UniProtKB/Swiss-Prot annotation:
Name of the gene encoding the protein in the UniProt record: ahpF
Residues engaged in binding FAD: 210-241, 469-479
Disulfide bonding pattern of the chain: 337-340
Pfam families per the UniProt record, alphabetical: Pyr_redox_2 (PF07992), Thioredoxin_3 (PF13192)
Subcellular location: Cell membrane
Protein name, as recorded: NADH dehydrogenase
Organism listed in the record: Ferdinandcohnia aciditolerans (strain JCM 32973 / CCTCC AB 2017280 / YN-1)
Keyword Electron transport part of the UniProt annotation: yes
Length: 519
């Protein structure tokens, strides 16, 4: 295996940042994956005098561990960490060499204070944009705490192991041999699940904000930055930074960037927010909003935050089909991310529910991996762009069924089929398959606001041209609102609008002394 010249050039620059020696212990067999893995580690060693290679026997073959001379860190890559995981490999080399990780000090302290033995195993696919966050978080924990170890396992290289554990979604994480979690997680979320997260009482003691942003997606980040630039006390509370774009692989319509990926854009947003004096409160969900002298936001952990104005940017989530079997077989054949989970269905039959752009794009993606794709569309015609439909219709292993109402997703311990009704004849049909990808759009994250402010029949928050809701001092932005179009760049613009609207509200509704301070 030879790295492409461009990648090798970039890698060479990163390897120059290594601060100490690194020993790669390699466990290889006679198979093609082992051969490619050996080529990769040998190439790494040829590029830096700080990297040496030693053959050994590890729990899995092919695999290699990343260590300091005389000290095992517990970091193991089972398979070849290329694709989206190449960054995970580079970071592991740098951090094991002694380069300080880019993590907040309180997070580092929490990791170091964990007591006990924790062995994590993360099952990933190299095409999964959600997996590197988990892999890099667990590697970081392994570097900082000798009681923690982590093995990344490429599902494509260890198919028998993946199938024996019925893993049908990535990333899936095991802890000490037992299922721990699945899906994207930050290091803060992992720490919280281990019971090592921040104390919720710290939030309740915070002074009131001038502007409190609820939600950390593009709209929320834009709102917080625009508010902070006005010199007013700004906070942002969010479950996770990045919002829905964290589940988006390819972004080609973000003006000024010909191409980027959701996780990269989310990281840039968070980095930009941290350039300002903004109180960022992650891993928190809002539970209740109440307008008093100040606006109160109660969090699910019981803490109450207070602010003179609030900007709601809670975004949207995948819409569920709402049929029997969907929840029962989630991550057991029911999936929402074709980029992440598609490789786990290689050579199998799957269905895609939804004939819009996202559904057709998913079907096109999956057609190159699986045996056959069936697209089920509720309406008489597909809603996807014509260019996508033309591409879809050119694929030999795709069947499109229109006027199809999904009735049930069937299975035993995992999905084995789907039933749908022909809306013309009302006849029910059943298709045997291994996976179902749900792609029927989004639903706004506004359930917690029921009865609090005006929402339309879709659950979207109704706002005016300034981003204001019908509750004085409460503004909203992004995909949770009645904005006509749901696009990243539009969400950012609406976030800026809401922040400026909130600032104008503060000027007109505070005492002269407070207004002068705000300026």
């Amino acid at each position: 295996m030879v790295l492409e010249p461009q990648i090798k050039s970039q890698l060479n620059q990163y390897l120059q940042l290594m601060e100490g020696d690194v020993l790669l212990k390699v466990s290889a067999g006679n198979d093609k994956v082992s051969e490619d893995m050996l080529s990769l580690v040998d190439e790494l060693a040829s590029m830096s005098s700080r990297i040496t290679v030693e053959k050994t026997n590890l729990e899995r073959t092919p695999s290699f561990s990343v260590n300091r001379p005389g000290e095992d860190t517990g970091i193991v890559f089972a398979g070849i960490p290329l694709g989206h995981e190449f960054t995970s490999l580079v970071l592991a080399l740098l951090q094991v060499s002694g380069r300080a990780p880019k993590a907040e000090q309180n997070v580092i302290d929490q990791i170091k204070n964990i007591e006990g033995e924790y062995h994590f195993e993360s099952y990933i696919s190299l095409s999964c944009q959600n997996c590197p966050d988990v892999v890099q978080a667990l590697n970081l924990m392994s570097v900082l705490n000798p009681g923690i170890s982590h093995t990344m396992i490429d599902g494509a290289a260890f198919k028998d192991e993946v199938e024996s554990k019925d893993i049908m979604a990535v990333p899936t994480v095991y802890l000490n041999g037992e299922s721990f979690t699945s899906g994207r997680m930050t290091v803060e979320e992992i720490l919280a699940q281990l019971g090592s997260g921040p104390d919720a009482s710290e939030l309740a003691d915070k002074d009131p904000f001038d502007v409190l942003v609820v939600g950390g997606g593009p709209a929320g980040a834009s709102s917080a930055i625009y508010a902070a630039r006005k010199g007013i006390r700004t906070g942002i509370v969010a479950d996770r930074f990045g919002g829905q774009i964290m589940d988006t692989l390819s972004i080609e319509n973000f003006i000024s960037q010909k191409y980027t990926e959701g996780p990269k854009l989310a990281a840039s947003l968070e980095e930009h927010v941290k350039e300002y004096d903004i109180d960022v409160m992650k891993l928190q969900r809002a539970k209740r909003l109440e307008k008093k002298d100040l606006i109160e936001i109660e969090l699910e952990n019981g803490a109450v935050l207070k602010s003179k104005s609030v900007i709601l940017s809670t975004g949207a989530r995948w819409r569920n089909v709402g049929v029997p079997g969907e929840q029962e077989f989630k991550n057991k054949g029911v999936a929402y991310c074709p980029h992440c989970d598609g490789p786990l269905f290689e050579g199998k039959d799957v269905a895609v529910i939804g004939g819009g752009n996202s559904g057709v794009e998913a079907a096109i993606d999956l057609a190159g991996i699986v045996n056959h794709v069936t697209v089920l569309e509720f309406m008489p015609e597909l809603k996807a762009d014509e260019v996508l439909q033309e591409r879809l219709n050119s694929l030999p292993n795709v069947t499109v069924i229109k006027n199809a109402q999904t009735k049930e997703i069937t299975g035993d311990d995992k999905v084995n089929g789907i039933s749908y009704m022909d809306r013309d004849t009302e006849e029910v049909h059943h298709i045997e398959l291994a996976g179902v990808f749900v792609q029927i759009g989004l639903v706004p994250n506004t359930d917690w606001l029921d009865g609090t402010l005006e929402r339309n029949r879709f659950g979207e928050i109704v706002v005016d041209s300034h981003g204001a809701t019908n509750v004085p001092g409460v503004f909203a932005a992004g995909d949770c609102t009645n904005s006509a179009y749901k696009q990243i760049i539009i969400s950012m613009g609406s976030g800026a609008t809401a922040a400026l609207g909130a600032f104008d509200y503060l000027i007109r509704n505070t005492t002269p002394a407070e207004s002068a301070a705000a300026k």
